[in-house]
């Protein structure tokens, strides 16, 4: 259980600051008789104080051998060494420092020594390097700004590249954390910054042979130029736009793929009326076909009257939304008609790999 405080037994004792007269009585009694038993000393010395208050006043202020003033470097090193061995046993630590009291050492440790160890990155409890110390990392932005101002990066484009700044900042953070966690030397990150700021172009790897790294070859100059002299750029001008493809079919201007009546044409073309009936046939001519970037012209030899079903097949915007099976059936029926020798047959033959005009 321990002893109860002496002040609980002494009711009505004086508390608070000591007066000079009380200091003189305590000093005179101890110099003449010694302190002896601190519980009985106040009555013997004629003081209205408790024994604990008399002891603390003598040990911390009235002793003749007490040392006052700033702690020396030798005393600080002794305190750190003894604290690592003994912990917070201030009375035992004070026994190794003549003239210093345990209360004075404790106050000095809490106000000065503890903060100094934290600034040095040392845990004041275990006296080992701190692994959760973030203070070296907090000044990375200042270090980065100073490096940029001093021109250490040697690249003014870094200021306009937020991604490079973020990457360098991450490298700085990782480097600091590794320095704190691992005691071994960490490689300098200047090489990382050099590779980051001056990246080398990546070569093109041949997909057929992964062991060889070759630049991408340019295609032959005349590969995509046909005999008629039409280049891919010129042929692209002849390709119709899918948005306004029906605007060019004005009054019997449909190419000669099939023979169409004006009634069927009016039915297929959006925005026209089906009441007008014209029996004139559309002229036959050359049907332009495209293979890649090449413009090919094939004469239309067959003629077939187009029904609304096939007309809707040629113009998707007017066709009703049907299932995939209906579409395939209509397409097969269309291919089985008299168009085996037409432009579509030629176009299908051109798309086959065996009859491709372009050598691969």
Curated annotation (Swiss-Prot):
It is found in: Nucleus. Keywords: DNA-binding, Nucleus, Repeat. Residues 299-324 are annotated as: Disordered. Pfam families: Myb_DNA-binding. GO terms for cellular component: Casparian strip; nucleus. The keyword Acyltransferase does not apply. Residues 10-62, 63-117 form the HTH myb-type domain. The keyword Transcription does not apply. PROSITE patterns: HTH_MYB. Residues 38-62, 90-113 bind DNA. GO terms for molecular function: DNA binding; DNA-binding transcription factor activity. GO terms for biological process: positive regulation of DNA-templated transcription; regulation of phenylpropanoid metabolic process; suberin biosynthetic process. This is Transcription factor MYB39. It comes from Arabidopsis thaliana (Mouse-ear cress).
């Amino acid at each position: 259980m321990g002893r109860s405080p002496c002040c609980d037994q002494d009711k009505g004792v004086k508390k608070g600051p000591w007066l000079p007269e009380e200091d003189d009585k305590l000093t005179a009694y101890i110099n003449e008789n010694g302190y002896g038993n601190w519980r009985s000393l106040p009555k013997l010395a004629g003081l209205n104080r408790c024994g604990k208050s008399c002891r603390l006043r003598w040990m911390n202020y009235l002793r003749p051998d007490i040392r006052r003033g700033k702690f020396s470097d030798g005393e600080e090193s002794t305190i750190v060494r003894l604290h690592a061995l003994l912990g917070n046993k201030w009375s035992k630590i004070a026994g190794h420092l003549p003239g210093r009291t345990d209360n004075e050492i404790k106050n000095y440790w809490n106000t000065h020594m503890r903060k100094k160890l934290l600034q040095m990155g040392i845990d004041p409890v275990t006296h080992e390097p701190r692994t959760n110390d973030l203070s070296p990392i907090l000044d990375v932005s200042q270090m980065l700004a100073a490096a940029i101002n001093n021109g250490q990066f040697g690249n003014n484009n870094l200021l306009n590249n937020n991604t490079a700044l973020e990457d360098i900042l991450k490298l700085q953070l990782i480097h600091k954390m590794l320095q704190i966690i691992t005691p071994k030397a960490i490689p300098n990150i200047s090489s990382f910054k050099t590779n980051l700021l001056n990246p080398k172009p990546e070569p093109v790897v041949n997909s057929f042979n992964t062991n060889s790294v070759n630049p991408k070859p340019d295609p032959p100059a005349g590969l995509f130029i046909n005999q008629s002299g039409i280049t891919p750029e010129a042929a692209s001008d002849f390709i119709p736009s899918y948005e306004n493809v029906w605007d060019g079919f004005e009054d019997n201007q449909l190419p000669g793929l099939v023979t169409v009546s004006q009634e069927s044409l009016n039915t297929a073309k959006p925005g026209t009326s089906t009441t007008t009936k014209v029996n004139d046939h559309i002229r036959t001519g050359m049907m332009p076909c495209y293979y890649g970037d090449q413009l090919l012209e094939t004469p239309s030899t067959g003629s077939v009257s187009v029904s609304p079903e096939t007309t809707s097949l040629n113009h998707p915007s007017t066709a009703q939304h049907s299932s995939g099976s209906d579409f395939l059936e209509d397409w097969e029926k269309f291919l089985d008609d008299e168009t085996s020798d037409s432009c579509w047959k030629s176009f299908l033959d051109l798309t086959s790999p065996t009859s491709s005009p372009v050598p691969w």
